[in-house]
Regions:
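Canonical AAA+ ATPase core
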Residues: 6, 33-37, 45-128, 133-143, ...
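C-terminal engagement/docking regions of AAA+ P-loop ATPases
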Residues: 159-239
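Short, small-residue-biased leader/transition segments that mark boundaries at the very start
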Residues: 1-9
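Walker B catalytic acidic pair
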Residues: 28-29, 40
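Conserved alpha-helical scaffold flanking the Walker A/P-loop in AAA+ ATPase domains
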Residues: 8-26
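Conserved AAA+ ATPase small/helical "lid" subdomain
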Residues: 118-175
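Residue-level signature of catalytic and energy-coupling elements of molecular machines
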Residues: 41, 88, 153, 182, ...
Length: 239
């Protein structure tokens, strides 16, 4: 075969399942991926399925994407489509490590076997089975969200569409994200009900990557976090 598609044998093919066929996918530096790759990931995130040679393959019911992103001012990055950003439940700014954490990193570099120990420290071990995860997710259905709190969530999301400094506000997916995430936060806090404080605590992580500021406000140095904080201060909180 001379590697031309029209003369190569085409009767011997097998699906080679790549890294996307998993329950938890870590996509490192997602904004360095070209548009075609981002489009394929978007389908996986939206449909929990991928299409290869016109055949659709289902992914794990627990398929979840964790992604890191480089600051946009770095060279070699691509803007993420708004539709793709909207598929992410939360966006969390990691920041730099504190002094104690960075000191531990420095200590690991001491000794002749430092490279090996650093690699060993990065080994990931399973901490929960998929069946246990399914059970935990089921418990979230028992977390109560009062009608007043649901109304507060809707008011916050719709408020982003009415704020002068915001060009594009959050869509209905943000409302869904609030319901999911606040229930999880309540469970982690040992409560069986969601409070308005849960909504406030998750407002920036849920809304931050879904909002687009007007250019004139960006030039003035206004940040999305500041706009969200002002919005929370303006909206009446249910008792």
């Amino acid at each position: 075969c001379d590697w031309s598609s029209d003369v190569c044998s085409s009767d011997l093919f097998a699906l080679m399942r790549g890294p996307v066929f998993t329950s938890f996918l870590l996509a490192d530096e997602i904004n360095r991926a070209p548009a075609k790759t981002q489009s394929a990931l978007l389908q996986a995130m939206q449909e929990r399925a991928v299409t290869i040679d016109r055949e659709t393959h289902a992914l794990s019911p627990n398929f979840t994407v964790f992604a890191t992103q480089n600051p946009i001012e770095y060279e070699g990055t691509y803007p993420l489509p708004e539709a793709q950003k909207d598929r992410f439940l939360l966006k969390i700014a990691m920041g730099s490590p504190d002094r104690d954490s960075e000191l531990i990193l420095a200590q690991r570099m001491l000794g002749s076997d430092a490279p090996e120990r650093v690699l060993e420290s990065g080994v990931v071990e399973a901490v929960i089975s998929e069946s246990d995860l399914d059970e935990l997710r089921g418990t979230l259905e028992e977390i109560v969200v009062r009608e007043e709190v649901l109304g507060y969530i809707v008011d916050v999301v719709q408020g982003t569409r009415k704020t002068d400094s915001i060009l594009v506000g959050a869509g209905p997916r943000a409302t869904q994200a609030f319901v999911l995430a606040t229930r999880a936060l309540a469970a982690l806090s040992g409560r069986d009900f969601v409070t308005p404080d849960d909504v406030k605590a998750l407002a920036a992580p849920i809304l931050g990557h879904r909002l687009i500021l007007r250019p004139e406000h960006e030039i003035e140095g206004v940040t999305v976090e500041e706009v969200i904080q002002r919005l929370l201060e303006e909206i009446a909180v249910p008792r």
